[in-house]
Amino acid sequence: MAHKKGQGSTRNGRDSHSKRLGIKEFSGEVVKAGHILLRQRGTKFKPGKNVGMGRDFTLYSLVHGQVEWDGSRRLVHVKPFNTA
């Protein structure tokens, strides 16, 4: 008989890396074209005016302007600055 217990294996020790989802630019913030506004899984929020949606449902700005969130309809808009 063994005097010491053999080393068993554990069933723990695994975890996935966080995906860094969520809102990146809030209402009133100034963004340039191409800035990421939101990372999400699925279409929890939908793109509004001057906002594009990537293949992984990421919302990004299409123009230089100010971010506007429409909370009631879950839309994100970017209000462009007037260029004279």
From Swiss-Prot:
GO molecular function terms noted in the UniProt entry: structural constituent of ribosome
Biased composition (Basic and acidic residues): 12-21
Any Gene Ontology CC annotation: ribonucleoprotein complex
The keyword Ribonucleoprotein belongs to this UniProt entry's keyword annotation: yes
Pfam families from the UniProt entry: Ribosomal_L27
GO biological process, one term: translation
Region (Disordered): 1-21
Family: Belongs to the bacterial ribosomal protein bL27 family.
Family matches, as PANTHER family: LARGE RIBOSOMAL SUBUNIT PROTEIN BL27M, RIBOSOMAL PROTEIN L27
Protein name as catalogued: Large ribosomal subunit protein bL27
Organism in which the protein naturally occurs: Methylacidiphilum infernorum (isolate V4) (Methylokorus infernorum (strain V4))
Source organism phylogeny: Bacteria, Pseudomonadati, Verrucomicrobiota, Methylacidiphilae, Methylacidiphilales
Gene name, Swiss-Prot/TrEMBL: rpmA
